[in-house]
Amino acid sequence: MTLFSSISSMSTSMSGSKSSISSFGSGTGMGSNSIACGGGCGGSGGILGSGLGLGLGLGLDLTGGSRSRGACGGNGGNRGNGNGGMGGGNGSCCGGPCCGI
């Protein structure tokens, strides 16, 4: 398993039924595609909530349904809101030229 080595900071914020986990450039995850789509390009929208992905790249995916988001945008994973910094709609950056993979 390949991990991206970088400084990561995680913060969990609970508000009603929403939970967002932010991670800067972390490619660690347990999802099916979280490593390939992780790091600066992001992974999924997190476990439960929206995960903003403001150019930071959300690389944590524990749901197994990761889609590229964060800096490259894309889908938000299983239940995320795909609010990536550069937009996108269906995870087209996952494994694509946008992420350089």
Swiss-Prot record:
This is HssA/B-like protein 40. It holds the Pfam family Coiled. Coiled coil: none annotated. InterPro entries: HssA/B-like_chaperone (IPR050533), HssA/B-related (IPR008455). It comes from the Eukaryota. It comes from Dictyostelium discoideum. Belongs to the hssA/B family. GO terms for biological process: sorocarp development. Residues 1-26 are annotated as: Disordered.
